[in-house]
Amino acid sequence: KILKLCNEHKIPVVPFGTGTSLEGNVVGNEKGITICLEKMNKILSVNVEDFDCRVQACVTKEQLNDYLREDGVFFPIDPGANAAIGGMASTSASGTMAVKYGTMKTVISGLTVVLPNGDIINTGSRTKKTSAGYNLTNLFIGSEGTLGIITEIQLRLSPIPESIMAAVCHFPTLENAVQTAQQVIQYGIPIARIEMLN
């Protein structure tokens, strides 16, 4: 109802989750309103055998991974801050593990979205692959609340790796660092996380 009213009266709306964005995505408009989603913080379902789950928009990545840990699966997108999953979907977040696990577009299989006119739609499905119809899910990922407010997210999960090894490498030039990263990937060396620091 709120979005419908705001739409009818041309009042700008900014959805707010955890506020961890570094890009100013949650900066409001003096003639608009902010809709706080912090109470939408429930993990709705987990299907370990199918490697997926459904969460509300303000579940954080740490909250979800703490919940999943005992089942041997995890949510692999790691933008750095303990962001809300809805915000991560809205900004098409990625992180240092994108080299192995992809981005939010890779791990989201469906959304529940409240449109500006107040209608509630569901996009996508739990299926791993489908070619039926338009890909409305990807339309909303990265739209930063401009097309509607994401309230629920269907996510693909990954198995927790048996072991993890970390290394820091120094390079004389930026070009050397980039070439080495490309070669590591081309040779098929399993790498889950890569980050360049200057």
PLM feature spans:
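Short proline/glycine- and acidic-rich turn/helix-capping motifs at secondary-structure junctions
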Residues: 22, 196-198
